[in-house]
Amino acid sequence: MLRQLCFQVFFFCFASLVYAEELEVVVRSEHITLPIEVSCQTDTKDPKIQKYLSSLTEIFCKDIALGDCLQPTAASKESSSPLAISLRLHVPQLSVVLLQSSKTPQTLCSFTISQNLSVDRQKIHHAADTVHYALTGIPGISAGKIVFALSSLGKDQKLKQGELWTTDYDGKNLAPLTTECSLSITPKWVGVGSNFPYLYVSYKYGVPKIFLGSLENTEGKKVLPLKGNQLMPTFSPRKKLLAFVADTYGNPDLFIQPFSLTSGPMGRPRRLLNENFGTQGNPSFNPEGSQLVFISNKDGRPRLYIMSLDPEPQAPRLLTKKYRNSSCPAWSPDGKKIAFCSVIKGVRQICIYDLSSGEDYQLTTSPTNKESPSWAIDSRHLVFSAGNAEESELYLISLVTKKTNKIAIGVGEKRFPSWGAFPQQPIKRTL
């Protein structure tokens, strides 16, 4: 039974290994970062408070460097450099102040610290993202949450179990979401709502069904009365459409369903394609909800297709002929790129398709199979999982530097990451 479940879920991720192509493209680019000095000061002489402020400042520096736009350096005191940030603590109020040559210091944000590092870490992430946007016009990405499936096979378990967890980009603030004692997979942030809702698939009723949970209410609610297996949900906030795959008619087909996050499905689901278009999977909306990218093996090999949905669903078109064994497409938040996986020289790599130019390129090159790329809000960074059938870890990769960093979490298989729950950044750009 476990093999059958795995086949259903991982079809588009693993089937493409059979058709490996001799393709390899390495892209290199130069980028320029903006130097900025970061210092901290406090009016207290308590050494514990001073040490704690230093810890927060260190986190802040890592956060603003994450976006690959700013190059922070720690300074022991406020300097006269052209651009600097000062973290000023008047217990319990911490202010983040912008210092520029010949200009009046500007407080970009301030908040109350609790001296609970887990709580204050999130506040620092939010402050760093505020500064990042103010200085660059590009959203900061340190305050987002990564939701993923963490699974293990215990000695007394016949079937693999997996719960959903969340973590920060650096592996900190790791916390469980579900406690269903079942297999929960493919979580996806919805992208709207102050309680940060997410969709996922759970096997707790025996067959996979789609559920809706949130950071405030982790007890998921089944969202569709549709019969059969339901997989790979994704949501368009703009169009209030839920896309998913179901085998209601025997074949794994692509469906769309008008859906309200508060009241549930509106009307009946619509089957977009039938068995003549092969097995379909991995749907992903563009930001406007007017188009859908997905995978189909109608030509024998899993390939990427795009379907326009406005004003009515139209015939899908093949996205790229270069990569014939593809899976896991993910449309970027800016609508300009699609990340996907493809087998290259026997290894599943992450590739990027540029919609404006029609060009695509290979992003990763390491000899480990990758899957499930998910975009940060800046459309310049991805989280993905990499490993094999028995083990898998989470990684971040920058499209700017092409560098990859492992998220150190601990034991267990980490799969299906989704990067989201980014707080709003209302501040205007300063520079």
Curated annotation (Swiss-Prot):
Keywords: Periplasm, Signal. It holds the Pfam family PD40. Gene3D superfamilies: TolB, C-terminal domain (2.120.10.30). The keyword Signal applies. Residues 1-20 form the signal peptide. InterPro entries: 6-blade_b-propeller_TolB-like, PD40. Transmembrane segments: none annotated. It is found in: Periplasm. GO terms for cellular component: periplasmic space. The keyword Signal applies. Belongs to the TolB family. This is Protein TolB homolog. It comes from Chlamydia pneumoniae. The gene is tolB.
